[in-house]
Amino acid sequence: MNLFASASTVAICSYALLSTVYKTAQVFYTLPTNVPPTSGDPPSGEPWPSVDVIIPCYNEAPRTLSDCLASIASQDYAGKLQVYVVDDGSANRDALVGVHEEYAGDPRFNFVALPKNVGKRKAQIAAIRRSCGDLVLNVDSDTILAPDVITRLALKMQDQAVGAAMGQLAASNRSETWLTRLIDMEYWLACNEERAAQARFGAVMCCCGPCAMYRRSALVSLLDQYETQRFRGKPSDFGEDRHLTILMLKAGFRTEYVPEAVAATVVPNSMGPYLRQQLRWARSTFRDTLLAFQLLRGLNIYLTLDVIGQNIGPLLLSLSILAGLAQFVTTGTVPWTACLMIAAMTIVRCSVAAFRARQLRFLGFSLHTLINIFLLLPLKAYALCTLSNSDWLSRSSAANVQDTGDALPKPNLVGSDAAYSEQQ
């Protein structure tokens, strides 16, 4: 056995050991997916908290935005509800006029136009500063909420120690392509394995942007840090959901996952947009990893394992693959140990997921292993080497302008660039 073969074997065995311990602990701590739904009412004599729903939109398709607003208008929430739709300098405002007019007579809906595109984070902040509800629900403009989402999230927020809570995500366009089916399974695993296990300890590490509720008192105290996030001296314009969640945890608040609060969001249906999305997510994850490591001292041992597993695991897998490739090039022999180990771990993981979800389709998630090895791992390496790049890759960089607070005008603008739904 030459040096490369030995290195590949050691790396893949270390990866297998770490993954086995991490995934076993994750399954052990995962909340059951069939737990009784969150139900009940606020404590006796207390009213339901008021909720502000904030929906930033940028060049969103009229039908997609209309479906999103319809799902919010039909919420069964018993408390006061206000909705803020923030148009972030869209070029297709003429096309959206009909959607706005549809809800113009509903006193719950407020439409705000920003004069120029400032980015999703600043669009959110513009609405946060003009609203006053007890709770703030961030919703992406391509997301459809189940009728009871706000009620279920608000019930979770009854505990004053909870600063944020997220719902379960699914792909609304799941049946569109093989990739959307794969992403839908990826979302299920991320929510019902990763987030569910983290929620056991009140430390969900990322309350995902399509459907996340925050306590206003906690949010306001962190707003300046959230707005002015910088990396290597430059403004950080993406990964807002992960960064805000980490800030909540640093401030001592719990972050929770509510599996029965289901939201369906549009996911990329082709490889190009998917890889651009993954590149942004990888950069934001790496940027916030240092903040996450600062939390380790106060976290449960499982959460420490979670942070280590998600960062060291891919590194060990990459080392094994690189050494295996070097072995093949230099000796012409196949690194069978690494290949068989990866195949075995894939089969076990997909089988466990299929059993827990009671859906055989999860056996097909094995395809994700090939995508991970040949596309996502190199992409993450590139992301690590280009951390200072804050380009969304699908639109021009956001300008730093002030919110004028104007009501939504009807400008004569035409054309359409990439929407937020393509950027998440």
From Swiss-Prot:
Pfam families: Glycos_transf_2
Subcellular location: Cell membrane
A single GO cellular-component term on record: plasma membrane
An annotated GO BP: extracellular matrix assembly
Membrane topology term: Peripheral membrane protein
Biological role stated in the UniProt entry: Involved in the synthesis of Nod factor, a sulfated N-acyl-beta-1,4-tetrasaccharide of N-acetylglucosamine which initiates a series of events in the host plant species leading eventually to nodulation.
Name under which the protein is recorded: N-acetylglucosaminyltransferase
Organism: Mesorhizobium japonicum (strain LMG 29417 / CECT 9101 / MAFF 303099) (Mesorhizobium loti (strain MAFF 303099))
Taxonomic path: Bacteria, Pseudomonadati, Pseudomonadota, Alphaproteobacteria, Hyphomicrobiales
Encoding gene, per UniProt annotation: nodC
